[in-house]
Amino acid sequence: MKSADPGVKIPGGTDFGKNTCLISDYLHSTGGNYNLSQPCVNIGMVGHVDHGKTTLVKALSGVWTDTHSEEVKRGISIRLGYADSPFMKCPKCPAPQCYTVEKTCPNCGEKTEEHRIVSFVDAPGHETLMATMLSGAAIMDGAVLVIAANEECPQPQTKEHLMALDIIGIKNIVIVQNKIDLVSREKLVENYHQIKEFVKGTVAENAPIIPISAQQNINIDVLIDALETQIPTPVHKVDKPASMLIARSFDINKPGASIDEIRGGVIGGTLTEGVLHPGDELEIRPGIKVTTEGSTKWIPIVTTISSIYAGPTKVEEATPGGLLAVGTYLDPTLTKGDSLTGQIAGVPGTLPETRHQFVMELHLLDRVVGVTREEKINEIKTSEPLMLNIGTATTVGIVTSARKNEAQVALKRPISAAVGAMVAISRRIDSRWRLIGVGVIKS
């Protein structure tokens, strides 16, 4: 099928980039193989519902990531949102005043210079959308934990999201005390001490706490300074075969488009290692479900890359770091409505096997977090359904065998994962999926 170039702003709150990344340290560490036209790092926005995550992304990037119809109507994030932001630096002003997202320094009027581009992953904070948050956490290099100053701390999903960061292994964290314009100084100090007490003994114990107002753009320079210090650009393996976690997929064609106007399916996500170019062959696993003569199996998809975009910027080479939109020659019906979300794309023959079941080593939490009554977590039992997050994939697994520190699960939907891959485990508690621990795939 012939596909035109899919270089457009992707719908669904997804704007995959704006300008150029200029990180000299990263260039040296990768031997100059870093693509200067794409973001360098993925930073997650996490925290309780309505604490200002999406507003903060807007303040940093100019992109309002809630564009899905239900998101607009309900005023909450439902899907993962994405936006890229260039961090600019004034050559004359000292830190933190030197940092801004503007092309002109708001302090001295000097023309600013591009420092680096970051991709923000806006995760929903509602308790019913924990699976979406966990799939977003899989592509985060660091996170901003947003806590509203006008509410008691911690709120249920503040606790659950911090626990998720800890379990998944995200250690580079900045805490934002948002909505400081809505409270008195006394209340602000009280809330600050609540935050300090809450994070004591956690992965975020030593994280800086930055008081801001995303709505009024207060202390945004201080926040950028903290992000530059606390969440460095990671060094990725560009000499390995390309592997990409798919976080979104789209059909970007408008209804009524003619045959000549139809563009191939688009996948969005992050490249974890290797390099991609237009013209490269791409395998996607597990692929598509095919039923013949009463037998069902999953068949990997093989396609060719037609174009690669970091935001509106078309690139001829994509390296790890930040979010990408990859145009393909796939039938767009295969990619519409996030139908390939959770799959892995990469060099044919190099991807992990497709698993319909696996055995995992268990590491359960002591107590359930994110609920009013934090009850003890019981051992996993045979025949119990569990929600499992592996990379950007979410599936349900039925426990077929369980011991104290090990369980075998049969998956409702297969995943592509290697031995040693980490699995976030959630259990149905009070009609909600609650995070109860982490597993490691053994076989």
From Swiss-Prot:
Presence of the UniProt keyword Metal-binding in the record: yes
One term of GO molecular function: tRNA binding
Database matches in InterPro entries: eIF2G, eIF2g_C, eIF2g_dom_2, eIF2g_GTP-bd, P-loop_NTPase, Small_GTP-bd, T_Tr_GTP-bd_dom, TIF2_gsu
CDD domains reported in the protein's UniProt record: eIF2_gamma, eIF2_gamma_II, eIF2_gamma_III
Region (G5) location: 213-215
Catalytic activity: GTP + H2O = GDP + phosphate + H(+)
E.C. number: 3.6.5.3
Domain tr-type G, first and last residues per copy: 38-235
Segments of this protein annotated with the region G4: 178-181
A biological process term (GO) from this entry: formation of translation preinitiation complex
Annotated segments matching region G3: 122-125
G1: region residues: 47-54
Residues that hold Mg(2+) 2 according to the record: 50, 75
Binding site for GTP: 50-55, 178-181, 213-215
Names of required cofactors: Mg(2+)
Binding site for Zn(2+): 90, 93, 105, 108
Quaternary state and interactors: Heterotrimer composed of an alpha, a beta and a gamma chain.
Free-text function comment from the UniProt entry: eIF-2 functions in the early steps of protein synthesis by forming a ternary complex with GTP and initiator tRNA.
PANTHER family for the chain: EUKARYOTIC TRANSLATION INITIATION FACTOR 2 SUBUNIT 3 FAMILY MEMBER, EUKARYOTIC TRANSLATION INITIATION FACTOR 2 SUBUNIT 3-RELATED
Protein name: Translation initiation factor 2 subunit gamma
Organism: Methanosarcina acetivorans (strain ATCC 35395 / DSM 2834 / JCM 12185 / C2A)
Lineage: Archaea, Methanobacteriati, Methanobacteriota, Stenosarchaea group, Methanomicrobia
Gene label: eif2g
